Amino acid sequence: MSTDIEGLPQEDINELVDETIAENEVVLFMKGTAIAPECGYSETALHHIRRHRDDVECVDILHSDEEFRAALERHSGWTTIPQAYVDGEFVGGADVLEELDERGELADALNA
């Protein structure tokens, strides 16, 4: 998914983030794409999700405006990227996904 939101008011950006989270069972807001992650944390998060599911919506926010990041923070309370959501609920970033995977709990968390 592209995040070309330049010039949109914050309310519209908030709505776009809300819709993306609501319309996808598993969504990962990351730096880069599923094919070419642009940071190690995004690559780690995607790796752990893909161990259990192939169907994940990846949203590249690398070049997004601060308003887009603010909309994400409104959902999660976190300022860091990546951020994973399952069934509309914030799960965590790379470290949380890795920990859940190591404990054998990630598959359940991802509805896999």
Where does each model-flagged region fall?
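Thiol/disulfide oxidoreductase modules built on the thioredoxin-like
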Residues: 72-80
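Cytosolic beta-strand hydrophobic patch enriched in CBS
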Residues: 28-29, 82-87
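Haloarchaeal acidic low-complexity proteome signature biased toward cell-envelope/secretome components but also
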Residues: 1-21, 107-112
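Local sequence-structure signature of Cys/Sec-based thiol-disulfide redox active-site neighborhoods
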Residues: 16-55
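Thiol-based oxidoreductase modules, predominantly thioredoxin-like and allied folds used
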Residues: 53-68
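Non-catalytic, surface beta->alpha helical segment in thiol-disulfide oxidoreductase systems
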Residues: 85-112
